[in-house]
């Protein structure tokens, strides 16, 4: 009991020490978080890349419905004040704003951006829900029965026809509490795994219904305390991020941070906007050290409207038999040199990332809406060298929100590399692995960060285009090599196409097809230590077809 009290005190101290001097940009009110991959994230990022939304922190996710509404409200104010010149961007902006205003109407009404109707009285209790259901037909070739799904919370493609359905309900109480619950049904048990997928230690899922996410968030002044199960994405990447994504099964955790961006007081106010995020999570039971802990800390900084910078650090410690307690173990890890032993030992990762908007420049940046460049540089263990750490990985990308004037096509190109250290030093299996924590920085064998894992490269290209205001067509290409440090490693080529139909502003249907050709496919064969077994001489040809419906209430 005392240990739990110490943990909570330490987390509270991190934010409160800063928050006592913080000046919130606006009144911070309790609000439920938008789930990762909600369509509003893409819409807000696109409008930010176009320069229509400014002063927006969009890298760290999730953020709340109220925060999203504030970004939309700010853009509406700029449009009403004629701060945005009429040009070809409106062909993209108008349908996006229509959907965003329908989605966040209650929040925009509270902000005064939209006039409240007489039939819409303010209420102490605000609630809503989202229904998602998908029907899939998967064919996994090469003698394989499952294939991991990237950024799907520990899920797998599993042979056969199946259904997945979840309902995400939320409730806000006054200005201080927000509750979210999301149970999920899967008709194929093999669509989820709690351990190895091949070999004598195979541990597949045995539940048709499980709790995907659930949380209670309390907000006071500009401090948000949240407890429950959930996912986070810390990094500017679209197809992955080095430290934290939703590739692995959702984490059970306590989160503490600033609910909204803030400015420093007095003369420091002009330095820009800041935001702090932290969490303490518990990993699964059946691993090297049962219920090992992860502490994460992130500082977001927006010095100007066109640039966002972030610093992130993850610390793995504790677990059954380790003799470590929180917060002492984290403090020791922060102050000690690397490669300690005994109760001083820990596993760490850190990154610095940025997102920058580059406006249109004649003959140099010909795109009508400009472009966005972003990147992430990470270190496994301590950042022992400057500027490039000795155990580095990186991610870089460009996003063009509007390729041609008067058109709606966009383009994203993203490259990630966790094989950099092996090529430079010869060290194999550095990222997501650790000599003492032999299960690594993983949950059920899935990396907490990028889905490609260690010693890997990933090239991702995606383009979308609106055929009409209600129909969006998307194409993606992905080339990936995993575990390049092994004599036999995996090579994947993937192509996909998807069509989204917005039936109404709050209902959409998506049809999708994915083709994969994988040479030497890999499967998890052990968690302790982590081992992935690759099938030499095997080429798997996979076909995935699916249809999903999403309805907001």
Regions inferred by a protein language model and the residue ranges of each:
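N-terminal periplasmic/intermembrane-space "pro-region" immediately following the signal or transit peptide
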Residues: 28-157
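Short loop/turn motifs that connect adjacent beta-strands in outer-membrane beta-barrel proteins
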Residues: 57-59, 81-95, 114-127, 171-179, ...
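Signature for the C-terminal beta-barrel architecture of outer-membrane proteins
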Residues: 233, 253-438, 454-461, 466, ...
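Bacterial N-terminal signal peptides
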Residues: 12-23
